[in-house]
């Protein structure tokens, strides 16, 4: 199993964000969380990516407990948060090179990810000059740099126009293959 969640609960004060959530995701599956605003979807993703801890229950990614083996989980997960943290004054390639240094990833992997996400025509531009769709692609490229086993994307299509929506879904589908 790539992801195993058992009885996860999370409270923010008196507000219950997650209540006894359980599920599993097998390698190769592409799944989505559906629910209204405030249903706990982003909270669950933050737990799975070790940004926050659950109050109760257990979650594993590739057999690693997210509350015990944070480093192993982080190495095996690529995460695109809802609010994509980009440095708008950096060039696309420069930004990816910076992130690649953090993961100790080769220059050839940067080129692979640029190609995979369709960023080649925009790779010479500053991130601040890009459309929302291309900024999402930069975030996705960053999440893919270290060739993670698991990819967690929080609202990757929010704010995209219909054409960009189709394009980013196709990129995600191709990455999942």
Question: Language-model features: where?
Answer:
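ABC transporter nucleotide-binding domains
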Residues: 3, 10-177
């Amino acid at each position: 199993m790539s992801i195993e969640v058992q009885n996860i609960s999370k409270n923010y004060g008196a507000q219950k964000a997650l209540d006894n959530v359980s599920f599993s995701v097998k390698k190769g599956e592409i799944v989505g969380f559906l629910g209204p605003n405030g249903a706990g979807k982003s909270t669950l993703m933050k737990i799975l990516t070790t940004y926050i801890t659950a109050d109760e229950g257990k979650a594993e990614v590739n057999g690693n407990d997210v509350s015990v083996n944070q480093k192993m989980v982080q190495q095996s997960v690529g995460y695109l948060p809802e609010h994509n943290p980009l440095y708008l004054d950096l060039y696309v390639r420069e930004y990816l090179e910076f992130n690649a240094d953090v993961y100790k990833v080769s220059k050839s992997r940067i080129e692979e990810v640029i190609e995979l996400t369709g960023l080649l025509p925009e790779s010479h531009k500053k991130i601040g000059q890009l459309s929302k769709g291309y900024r999402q692609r930069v975030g996705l490229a960053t999440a893919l740099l270290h060739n993670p086993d698991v990819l967690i994307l929080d609202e990757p299509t929010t704010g995209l126009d219909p054409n960009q929506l189709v394009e980013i879904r196709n990129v995600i589908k191709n990455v999942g293959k």
